[in-house]
Amino acid sequence: VKLVMPRGSEKLYRKAPGWNHFFGEVKQAREVCNPEACLIPTPMDLKVNAKAAPLQVAGNWKIVAADGLANEQEHAERILKERVEQHKDLKKGGQLTMTLALDETLADNEAYTLDVQQKGVVIKGKTAAGVFYGLMTFDQLLRGDASKVGCDAIPQLSLKDQPRTHVRELMVDPCRIFVPYEDLKAFVPEMARYKLNMLHLHLVDDQAWTIEIKKYPRLTAEASSRWGMDDMLMPIKGYYTQEQMRDFVAYCAKYHIQVVPEIEMPGHEVAAISVYPELTCQGVQKPIRTTCGVSDELLCPGNDFTYEFLGNVFKELADIFPSEYIHLGGDEAGNPALDCWTYCPKCQALKKKLGITTTDRSENWKLQGYLFDKVIDLLRTQYHKTPMFWYETDFKKI
């Protein structure tokens, strides 16, 4: 088999200096950016004045920010330092001006307007978040495409934008493959660039427990390391301390991103079960999983320790994560579904107490509903949290 391709074309696919996972590398700057090609997501309304002289971005910039926008001013300074050739003294001012202001007439809390003029840029937002998203749009215009190099000029334009949805989430799973803390932080500015506003941390699964719980130190001491997934003969280990997570939450807040922790239940809990087998119906210790798939090891809804354990875990999480949301998982609860509860005396006693007359697995889902109802009531009444779940979970209190 002979591969036919232009001579030298393989060089186009080599990793250039400065390459990373988030953007490609372009060696030469574009002269004038094309807003319609470089803005992701597409703004709600964009008008480009192609006949007017474009904004030449190289120069000394002056930033004028309204009260309450100190964080956004810092981001503006960072963007200009990273993207613009001449920026020797941003505070002293110069030929170009960036104005950051609030506009209460805008309809949505995350709405903003951006006007590019020949001598500068005006960004207005309903709130500081709106101003921030305007800055992220300006950053994309400065890049001109997906590169670090950027453009020499931006056409004069008027842009109005607001989110199509208010939950724009990225999920990161440090359980299957642990993500070191500094690498986790690297996701944040790239999320913000595309106006994602929620980082869903999948902290618990069959393969690892990755968040420090001071009430239960054995969780991270014994359940945060294992051999690699699916015959990868390399150790996987690591967890986040509470101090790291508090720092991470504060770091994300600067990018208007909230962090939502997830604690799976009743399935995907083998890591915890490996340390505390009394969480299950059988009370038998099981090893941490080193493969994907669905485990039939579940938390026992008829066991008082299950609720004691979850209550203590959520008490500490509520103190770390100020987000209004906590994710409770709920997916893939056993294979066959919830079958281990069929033969559990505690679960059968709970069924009888709840007036469930079947003894087979046909109504075991009602026990899952009972488990979630108790946890949801705890989260809402004591910690004022709103629960989130995977799509297959459907109970009236959710």
Regions found by a protein language model. Name each.
Residues 1-31:
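Solvent-exposed loop and capping/linker segments of extracellular ligand-binding repeat ectodomains
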Residues 11-14, 73, 209-211, 268-271, ...:
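Extracytoplasmic/secreted cell-surface and envelope-processing proteins
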Residues 16, 83, 251, 255, ...:
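Alpha-helical structural signal in soluble globular domains
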Residues 31-166, 358, 378-381, 388-396:
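Acidic, contiguous N-terminal accessory segments
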Residues 11-14, 70-74, 107-108, 177-180:
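Short, solvent-exposed loop/turn elements at domain surfaces
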Residues 272, 277, 289-290, 294-398:
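Active-site neighborhood of glycoside hydrolase catalytic domains
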Residues 106-325:
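Feature activates predominantly on carbohydrate-active enzymes
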